[in-house]
């Protein structure tokens, strides 16, 4: 073993040589010393065991090269450790164990010709090709790419994030005692499946076991926050020696690939859906969501903040080329600290598929601002390697919040200055009483703010004011981005899931963002919410399997937004970033998640309209509690909300009928400021109508005054026209006249409107005729036209009913009588003729019947005119009725007109009406004519109707005759 010797990273160039002569000499020395040491079987097994991560599954690339040496070139030199064993086959341990080793597979295929006695590996050649394919695009100069030292226990994965250097020895002992059974059956070291229940320890288990120990401050504290914790963090941070800042811009030789499944896929381009994970504050597989700067620029995302990879080829490149750049020149102590920092930043840093740019060690507090400013300037000059807003990453994230142990804008790369500016602008200094620590409260705002800047403001350290120019573009993307800035925890059902992980007081939540759309909960969340949604009365909604806009969108913070009513959005009862969709805004929430402003603990999606809010707790309680009897006084302060709700509106209408004066005054005071809005509301208009009916007289007058100057637009509105009609019915005459005059010049427009015609009809009914002369005079010369209009025909009928002025009547009737036949056959005009027959004067009926004489059979066979003929039979006098019957019977014994009418689909109803309305003598005459044709009528569909009616009449006549015969002898 070679303790404390770190390998210096080196980038591959375009030439064939992988490294220079100096490095070849150094590597030769290291390999020679390593070869001279004979490792016992148990030591070798321990060494191999250290190569696998105790915190997360290693990459396939790393597993292949881990046991074979860190500087392999594909030949037998990397596998000299296998050649120095104690057994005859050249192995120092059990054959079965080494045959499971993926490094042995490469060794076998490289040396099988030199040593035919080598036992075959347990991995097929096809699996090897897949592993080599995943490895081929890596720019690591051999090795796993995780900066582990050769045969050194100081490997990154031997000390997971959250462990300080005092815990390394204990962790090594635990790793040494681990049995070889941790090797998976698929031959990959520490590569469990994606399923639940792997044998390997998770980060959560390690954190829980290490709760009592201090942690060095990286950028993310890894255990629940307390004052002592931050004190320890600051002390630990101050104890760290400054390490050299690494260069910016050069591609990094360190890469990680995400574990895609329990076994190697035969396809080198794995399905990106396999990487989807729960967007909870949990640790994610190494490498998920990481894309190098060069690759990121060529990635086409669905939205500005969508971190998902759209192409499977991009995913392959990302898996093998996810970089963390760095430079050499680190001392041994700084190397160890940076190794730990690299993994910690990787595990807790950007998760959103944004570019991971060059990470830096912790500088001293005295020179933080100077270094950060220079490095930020450098990062702006190098747009290809640094994260910018154009790439979706924002300001270079490694320089954010250098003076803050907890911050919550890591996902989109905003520096503290921009964050605090947004906090000031959007009022994120309203914290929920649920979260008691400053860290949780700081993450409650939708923009996220430093926990030590509760009121917003600028952070001096690490600040570059030039980057605040990106705020406008960032705000535009927030307002218009399809994926939205959402928080999964804003969903109260998600609180149960989050609470089970004990996350509310964890400061690491501040920076644990799931920006990558493929890191969203596609399986676990839907399964969980599917079972939980029934508790809240709303089914789970989702789009396609790839849709991340419902409960799965990239989040903008781990904590929900401010629950208080937002001062920039006074009409919304919630804060600004809710993940709830438009169809779910009225879902019932637990009362514990509500606050005094009527909002819900959560945020409001920015693409929702301003009038889409969540109902108040009072309204929700009213709708959910069916047994309790509410009174009007109990909903004080919520009358407008109740009026806009279906059940709340009905409740107010019922209570207003028997309300006291005080209750009416309370309702009146609340609805008056919103009267016009309620008049056009689907449910609110009924409350206004009911108040016109049952309100106090002064209140009705004041409410009617609200209508002035708005009569025409309200008359043309679906719900407003109902309020206008009710007002015309109940308000005082002077107000009626004033309201009606607003329609002057717009009468014909209102008559032809589906809503306005009702207002005109109500004016004709309720306003004295002398006050609506301008309406009636508009109809002169247009009576026939209006009579054939679907809405105008109703207005003409109201005129015939309520206008009794002789001059008006004569003018209207003259136009109608001149076109009786045409109107009788019109689909709307026939109603006007029927109205005249029913309500007109006798001489007017006679004129109409005479006009139809000679055309009765023809009119009876017409769909609309047949109704007019029936009205003539119903309302005509005996002489007029006899005249019509004789025309139907005809002049011959065959009764041809009658036969034609009985077989017609419309005229047969006229014949039935004749049998109902004529006297007994005429009925007997008609029945005698019909009986002759009964057998023939049974063959026709409509003739059967006549047969059935005749049979009933005959049966009724026979019974009547029988009764008469029985009563006559008794009388005698």
Swiss-Prot record:
Alphabetical list of SMART domains matching this protein: Pumilio
Pfam families per record: NABP (PF07990), PUF (PF00806)
Main location class: cytoplasm
Disulfide bonds: none
Notes on the domains: The pumilio repeats mediate the association with RNA by packing together to form a right-handed superhelix that approximates a half donut. The number as well as the specific sequence of the repeats determine the specificity for target mRNAs.
Record-level GO cellular component terms: cytoplasm
Protein name: Pumilio homolog 2
């Amino acid at each position: 073993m070679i303790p404390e010797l770190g390998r210096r990273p080196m980038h591959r160039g375009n030439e064939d040589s992988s490294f220079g002569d100096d490095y070849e000499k150094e590597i030769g020395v290291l390999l020679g010393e390593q070869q001279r040491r004979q490792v016992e079987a148990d030591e070798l097994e321990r060494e191999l065991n250290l190569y696998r991560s105790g915190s997360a599954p290693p990459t396939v690339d790393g597993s292949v090269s881990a046991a074979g040496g860190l500087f392999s070139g594909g030949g037998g030199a990397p596998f000299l450790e296998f050649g120095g064993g104690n057994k005859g086959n050249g192995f120092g341990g059990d054959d079965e164990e080494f045959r499971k080793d993926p490094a042995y597979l490469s060794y076998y295929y490289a040396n099988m010709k030199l040593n035919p006695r080598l036992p075959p590996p347990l991995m097929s050649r096809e699996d090897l090709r897949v592993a080599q394919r995943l490895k081929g695009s890596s720019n690591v100069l051999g090795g796993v790419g995780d900066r582990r030292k050769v045969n050194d226990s100081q490997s990154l994965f031997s000390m997971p994030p959250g462990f300080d250097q005092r815990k390394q020895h204990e962790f090594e002992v635990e790793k040494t005692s681990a049995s070889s059974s941790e090797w998976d059956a698929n031959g990959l070291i520490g590569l469990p499946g994606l399923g639940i229940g792997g044998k390997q320890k998770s980060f959560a288990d390690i954190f829980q076991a290490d709760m009592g120990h201090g942690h060095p401050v990286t950028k993310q504290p890894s255990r629940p926050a307390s004052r002592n914790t931050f004190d320890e963090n600051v002390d630990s941070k101050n104890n760290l020696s400054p390490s050299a800042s690494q260069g910016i811009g050069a591609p990094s030789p360190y890469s990680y690939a995400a574990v895609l499944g329990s076994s190697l896929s035969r396809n080198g381009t794995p399905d990106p859906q396999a990487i989807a994970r729960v967007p909870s504050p949990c640790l994610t597989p190494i490498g998920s969501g990481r894309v190098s700067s060069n690759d990121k620029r060529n990635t086409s995302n669905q939205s500005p903040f969508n971190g998902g990879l759209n192409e499977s080829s991009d995913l392959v490149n990302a898996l093998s080329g996810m970089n963390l750049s760095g430079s050499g020149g680190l001392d041994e102590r700084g190397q160890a600290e940076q190794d730990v920092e690299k993994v910690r930043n990787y595990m807790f840093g950007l998760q959103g598929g944004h570019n991971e740019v060059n990470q830096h060690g912790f500088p001293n507090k005295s020179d933080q601002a100077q270094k950060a400013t220079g490095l930020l300037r450098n990062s702006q000059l190098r747009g290809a390697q640094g994260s910018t807003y154009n790439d979706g990453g924002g300001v270079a994230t490694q320089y954010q919040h250098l003076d803050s142990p907890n911050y919550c804008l890591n996902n989109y790369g905003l520096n503290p200055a921009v964050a605090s500016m947004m906090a000031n602008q959007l009022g994120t200094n309203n914290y929920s009483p649920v979260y008691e620590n400053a860290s949780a409260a700081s993450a409650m705002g939708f923009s996220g703010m430093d926990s030590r800047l509760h009121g917003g403001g600028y952070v001096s350290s690490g600040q570059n004011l030039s980057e605040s120019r990106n705020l406008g573009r960032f705000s535009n993307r927030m307002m218009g981005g399809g994926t939205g800035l959402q928080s999964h925890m804003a969903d109260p059902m998600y609180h149960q899931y989050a609470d089970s992980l004990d996350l509310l007081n964890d400061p690491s939540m501040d920076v644990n963002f799931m920006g990558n759309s493929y890191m969203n909960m596609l399986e676990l969340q839907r399964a969980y919410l599917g079972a939980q949604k029934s508790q809240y009365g709303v089914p789970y909604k989702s789009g396609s399997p790839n849709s991340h806009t419902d409960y799965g969108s990239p989040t903008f913070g781990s904590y929900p937004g401010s629950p208080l009513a937002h001062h920039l959005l006074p009409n919304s009862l919630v804060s600004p970033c809710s993940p709830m969709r438009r169809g779910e805004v009225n879902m019932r929430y637990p009362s514990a998640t509500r606050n005094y402003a009527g909002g819900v603990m959560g945020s409001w999606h920015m693409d929702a309209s301003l009038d889409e809010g969540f109902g108040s707790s009072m309204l929700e309680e009213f709708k959910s509690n069916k047994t309790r009897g509410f009174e009007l006084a109990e909903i004080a302060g919520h009358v407008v909300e109740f009026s806009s709700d279906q059940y709340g509106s009905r409740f107010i209408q019922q209570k207003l009928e028997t309300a006291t004066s005080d209750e009416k005054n309370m309702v009146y005071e609340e609805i008056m400021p919103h009267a016009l809005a309620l008049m056009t509301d689907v449910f609110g208009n009924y409350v206004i109508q009911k108040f016109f009916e049952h309100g106090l007289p002064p209140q009705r007058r004041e409410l009617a005054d609200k209508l002035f100057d708005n009569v025409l637009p309200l008359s043309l509105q679906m719900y407003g026209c109902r309020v206008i009609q009710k007002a015309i019915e109940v308000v005082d005459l002077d107000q009626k006249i004033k309201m009606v005059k607003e329609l002057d010049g717009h009468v014909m427009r209102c008559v032809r409107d589906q809503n306005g015609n009702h207002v005109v009809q109500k004016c004709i009914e309720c306003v004295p005729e002398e006050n609506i002369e301008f309406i009636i005079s508009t109809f002169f010369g247009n009576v026939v036209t209006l009579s054939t209009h679907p809405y105008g025909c109703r207005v003409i009928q109201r005129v015939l009913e309520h206008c009794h002025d002789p001059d008006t009547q004569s003018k209207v009737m003259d136009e109608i009588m001149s076109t009786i036949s045409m109107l009788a056959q019109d689909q709307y005009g026939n109603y006007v003729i029927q109205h005249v027959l029913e309500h007109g004067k006798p001489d007017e009926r006679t004129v109409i019947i005479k006009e139809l004489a000679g055309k009765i059979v023809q009119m009876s066979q017409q769909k609309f005119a047949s109704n007019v003929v029936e009205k003539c039979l119903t309302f005509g006098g005996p002489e007029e009725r006899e005249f019509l019957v004789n025309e139907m019977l005809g002049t011959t014994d065959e009764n041809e007109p009658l036969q034609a009418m009985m077989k017609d689909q419309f005229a047969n109803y006229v014949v039935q009406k004749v049998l109902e309305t004529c006297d007994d003598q005429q009925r007997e005459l008609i029945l005698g004519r019909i009986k002759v044709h009964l057998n023939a009528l049974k063959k026709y569909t409509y003739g059967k109707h006549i047969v059935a009616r005749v049979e009933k009449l005959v049966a009724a006549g026979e019974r009547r005759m029988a009764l008469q015969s029985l009563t006559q002898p008794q009388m005698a």
